[in-house]
Amino acid sequence: MHYSLFFGAALAASVSTVSAEAGCNNDGGNWYCSAVDLITYSGFSTSGTYDLVTSMSGGKCGSEKHEYSGAFGPLGEELSIHLRGPMQLFSMAVYNRGSGEKPKRELKPSIHERRHGHSHQRFHEKRAVGDKVVAIIDGQVVSWINEYAGGAPAAPTSAPGAPGINEPQVKSNGYKGGDKPKDPKPHGPVNVAPGDWRRVALVDTDKQEAEGVSFLNNNGGWDKGVDQAFGAALKRLGLDDDFFGMGDGPNFPKDPTIPDGKELIIMSDKSCEGGSCGFTRPGADAFHGFGGEDKIFLFRVAMPLTGTRGSSIYDPKDMPAIWLLNANIPRTSQYPMDPTCSCWKSGCGEFDVLEVLAPGDKRCKSTYHTKQELSGGSSYYFDRPEEPITIAVVFNGDDGTLYVKTLKEGFDKFPETLSPEDVKKLCASDGKTNNFALAS
């Protein structure tokens, strides 16, 4: 959704001829054809550069050229998840494809990382308590939550309470602001067969469970130690936030509703320590995104109508959205006053999964944002899910295709592993499909 209020019309206009021939309609500068259940994106530019921010000081930002490569271009790098209300978030999961030879934790280091030592693996060789450990045992890839810290055994933690998701109070573990929450509850090893997809993150607001995630907002630009000149900054959510609270273990929503116009950001639970993320904004909270070229995002959500209207384009009411950003964007500035303080303008990548472009509209568009000549979005749309549905976003490196599918039935539970057959079903056409080829 980043900047799409400004550039959405331009992208739609670029396909105006095709849309007109297909009998589609221009509504408010955006082209709409008909509703579909599946949109595929192919033809990504597989190599290129963007301007990676390397300094933020004195109201100015510096950058250097960063090279990327892979089936999905810059979207093959770490991504952050962004949700805008009105929305009910019931559950969310992220998966990476397993390997028969060794666990595929990350892609090989980028050229920038090789030059500057910002390798994710280098800074995470020692597993801390609460970290997920992956190993090969008897030829099988297994993972578990590390409970051994090298010293005395940790004291047992109590299981999460079970209040209803709409109850106003939740049990506090003392977390507030940037303090570290308790470690998540342990669970046993998970066998991952070669070719299967392993769950690396989960949010379940019904069970009040979360693993492998951090919840943030972009309101940290006014915190102590954060330079206000650069605009919005990441801040981890705490007890003082108006629509999220804390439970025993990791933080989780006390209510599944994201209020109208509010934004929620979800990143991994791995903080950017020791320069493992490269440069991040001084004073702001910083976490790794969800990496790997092959990845799946599943969302169980509803986008109810509110009938409200914002005072300006900067106040998007009754316009829910789900989008993915290159994690380098929010780690510096998602909405910068100076565009050089974000890599967005130079093409580091955004994918709008489902976005309502006008207040109260019942149509959701999807769009890929990178360098303008390589950007694009389908003129076909998804029906706004006023009732709960599952949304699947599949980055399949085997065929270089990104699949976005809405499922009104099935896949309402997100298991620890997905088989290749499960993923085929997620990517299968049910008859209402649009295949969009990018101009790579």
UniProtKB/Swiss-Prot annotation:
Residues 1-20 form the signal peptide. Induction: Highly expressed both in vivo (during infection) and in vitro (keratin medium) conditions. It comes from the Eukaryota. A motif (ExDxxE motif) lies at residues 350-355. Keywords: Allergen, Cell wall biogenesis/degradation, Glycosidase, Hydrolase, Secreted, Signal. Residues 153-164 have a biased composition (Low complexity). Residues 113-125 have a biased composition (Basic residues). It holds the Pfam family YJL171C_Tos1_N. The keyword NAD does not apply. It is found in: Secreted. GO terms for cellular component: extracellular region; fungal-type cell wall. GO terms for biological process: cell wall organization. Residues 100-112, 177-186 have a biased composition (Basic and acidic residues). InterPro entries: YJL171C/Tos1_C (IPR018805), YJL171C/Tos1_N (IPR018807). GO terms for molecular function: hydrolase activity, acting on glycosyl bonds. Probable circularly permuted 1,3-beta-glucanase involved in cell wall modification through beta-1,3-glucan network alterations such as increased branching or remodeling. This is Probable circularly permuted 1,3-beta-glucanase. The lineage of its organism: Eukaryota, Fungi, Dikarya, Ascomycota, Pezizomycotina.
